[in-house]
Structures are given as C-alpha cells and as structure tokens.
C-alpha cells in the first residue's frame, strides 16, 4: 500500500519563487543535485540509508492540482503564465539513489537528482525531509540492534514521534535498521512488516494484582505474550510473577 497523498506543495516557498525566476528568465539548464550529510548522528561511525520508497512515491505523484495553483495564486507572488506552466508540470529528470539499508558515510550522496533546474529545485526540500529523517531513525535502530547482541529489538516509537508521518515512516525506517517488529499497526498494513506489542501499565492496574494481570494476558495470547515488568517493582516481584 502506498501513500496516495499529493505532496507537491511539501516544499519551501523559495523553491517556488526561484522556479518562477528561472521561468521568467527563460533559463532551465540541466543540473545535478546531491543529497548528503556532513556528520554521522549520535557520534556514530556510520549511518544507514533509508527513505527511498517514500521518495519514489513522492516523485511519481508530483503534480500541481487546480487547488494547488489556486492557493499559489492567492499568495500574489506568482504570475498567471507561471501558474499555467505549473498545471502542466511533470518531473522529467533522473534519480539515482543508494539502496535502503546500505551503510553510508558523510559526504557520500544518498540521492542524486539530474534534472532541469526548475524541477531539481522543486524536489529538493521534500527529498531532504524524507531521506534525512528516515536515515536518522534507521541509524539509531541499527545501533540499538547492534548493542543488543542478537536479542530481538522491537520498535515502539509511535506515541513519542513528532507527528503521525514521523511515527509511520519512522517505524518502517527502524525495521530497515534491524528491528524485528513495530507496534504501529498502520505501518504493518502499509508496508507488510510484523506488528508486535506488549500491554500497557493500565492493563496491570486494572486488575487486583500484577500476577493476575500477567496470568489473564498470558491466557489470552499464549503464543504472543510479552509481559511488561516495570509497572510496580521492576527488579523484584514483577520478575518473580513471571
């Protein structure tokens, strides 16, 4: 399942004002834009490339709807001949990218765009947004998975993510980084990855005691039972109750 939203206006205003500048000056040379980073995150010695799938979906659906053009007209920044051009806009360039899950290093291009400058300018912001965020999450996940020394790591970041998209695509990126499952059900549906989970502290607190809560949950899900031990006494009775 793909993300069917039209994200064409997911860009900085200056990309569009520069596009109009190129249009008005009748200049649209073919250029090369490289997306890269200067420093590994988390003091890491490497990073993990991610975000390519969403980037491809974004490029495939890149077009200005009538609603988009009407909105841009309302800003009073754009002339009618340029807005007419946008209605017929399609991306015609070439994109080269490192496969997701690849180990990458500073100043190494993750995505290379070869296109007329008006087109390359437009896609710059969204591609950086998509690739930077998801590569960050994949890198963090990879480091956690490595530190776990072979124990399975699950992704539970949705409730702490910076909004729905960060949770949805961050979960996918964590899987690329080596996690064995995610708590995000929509990520599981959209990208066909395993969904896994435990129970909440509220489940424990809704029963007379912790042992009863554990027992009832284990009876319900004998083949998929992961118990949360840090509601009351993490290193004491909680472990004994298991």
Sequence positions of predicted segments:
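Ordered alpha/beta subdomains of enzyme catalytic regions
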Residues: 1-223
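Short beta->alpha linker loops
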Residues: 99, 232-233
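Disordered, low-complexity tails and leader-like regions
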Residues: 38, 236-238
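Short acidic loop-to-helix transition motifs that present clustered carboxylates
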Residues: 210-212, 233-236
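Catalytic beta/alpha-barrel core
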Residues: 226-231
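Conserved small/polar residues in nucleotide/adenosyl-binding loops
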Residues: 240-242
